[in-house]
Design a protein with these regions (language model features):
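Conserved, structured core segments of small domains
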Residues: 1-112
């Protein structure tokens, strides 16, 4: 089965303006994803890391990419196709609570 990385974006305002029964259904959906072995978590504070030409590590305590909504969480899921992965994340809190979820196919590099 193929692996996918998902990035959920959303904020508290969008969450709060979503009906409680929809939020509850989304959290139940997340529980079902957990039960299938999906690796899921909320986003902490990011740190950028650079080591240009291997000449020394430089860090910046902030996200590199910018978006209208903050990153809320990440998941690694398995599905037969990207369409199946989309169907899996369509019921998650970020998808239903005025946020958005990106689905990225994970191309696993062979071990060297």
């Amino acid at each position: 089965m193929a692996k996918f990385i998902t990035i959920g974006y959303g904020d508290q305002a969008g969450y709060e303006r979503t009906a409680p029964e929809i939020r509850d259904a989304a959290h139940a959906h997340d529980e079902r994803l957990w039960a299938t072995g999906a690796l899921m978590g909320t986003a902490g504070s990011p740190v950028q890391v650079r080591n240009t030409n291997g000449e020394g590590i430089m860090t910046t305590p902030m996200a590199y990419m910018r978006s209208d909504l903050p990153v809320a969480g990440f998941a690694v899921i398995e599905a037969p196709t990207i369409d199946d992965a989309i169907a899996l994340v369509a019921g998650t809190p970020c998808s239903v609570a005025h946020g958005v979820v990106e689905v990225w196919p994970l191309k696993v590099a062979p071990a060297t």
